[in-house]
Design a protein with these regions (language model features):
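Donor-nucleotide binding loops and adjacent catalytic segments primarily
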Residues: 19-24, 28-114, 145-149, 153, ...
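Short, small-residue-biased leader/transition segments that mark boundaries at the very start
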Residues: 1-5
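Two-component system phosphotransfer/interaction surface
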Residues: 166-179, 208
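A donor-sugar binding/catalytic signature common to diverse glycosyltransferases
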Residues: 102-143
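Short beta->alpha connector loops at strand-helix junctions that form conserved
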Residues: 6-8, 134-137, 160-164
Length: 214
């Protein structure tokens, strides 16, 4: 017999983290919060594009930005500084190699910029977070693109394919979303509608059936 499990388990902390509490914990104010990351190794194209957005936020202060550049992206802070922003002098910028408190950071965010892996998308949906998705082109059967398009077609996210990714394109898309609160709220609602928050229970139920325990 075949067993097909499509649901990705969501960490309990993702389901319980609260926006206002998380912002307070992170020392954030009422300005829009952008969270961006490209995975634990980082992604060069994402880092290069995000550097433009981070540098501009450092100069004009319009957004608060949390960005993880990954283990191969240690050149990122230097790139931002070359664009005219001293990260150390900008209280609205939180730039680090890794995010080890993802539930808190994601809860605090108004917009998430990231890849389109299944687990990441499950967490975004569970929290109802609007997203700009940049699918990795280096995966089997282009599955991240298809993952992303499921959210785009549901009105829960926007997409920028890596071949089209530039700092200017990312800034345009970010501004278009964050300057439209009604659109953000609609994206949030649609994302949350897609959420499967009981994946652990579903998987447990299927496994029990396969093992003949029910």
């Amino acid at each position: 017999s075949e067993m097909c499990i499509r649901d990705s388990p969501v960490r309990q902390e993702i389901l319980t983290a609260k926006k206002e509490e998380s912002r307070k914990e992170l020392g954030l104010d009422n300005r829009p919060v952008v969270l961006s990351f490209g995975g634990s190794l980082g992604a060069r194209k994402i880092n290069e594009a995000v550097a433009d957005l981070v540098a501009r936020s450092g100069i004009d202060g319009r957004y608060q930005h949390i960005h993880a550049y990954g283990s191969y992206g240690d050149w990122f802070p230097q790139l931002v500084e070359e664009k005219g922003t001293d990260i150390a002098d900008c209280s609205n910028l939180d730039i680090r190699p890794y995010i080890d408190n993802m539930p808190t950071c994601m809860a605090a965010a108004d917009l998430v910029i990231c890849r389109a892996g299944a687990i990441t998308l499950s967490e975004i949906q569970a929290m109802g977070k609007p997203a700009i998705l940049i699918p990795s082109p280096n995966v089997a059967e282009n599955h991240q693109y298809h993952n992303a398009m499921a959210l785009v077609n549901a009105g829960a996210a926007d997409i920028i394919e890596e071949k089209d990714l530039t700092g200017a394109a990312l800034m345009r898309k970010t501004d278009k979303m964050l300057l439209n609160p009604e659109k953000l709220e609609k994206y949030s609602e649609n994302s949350r509608k897609m959420a499967i928050t009981d994946a652990n229970e579903r998987i447990y139920s299927v496994v029990k059936k396969v093992l003949g325990l029910v």
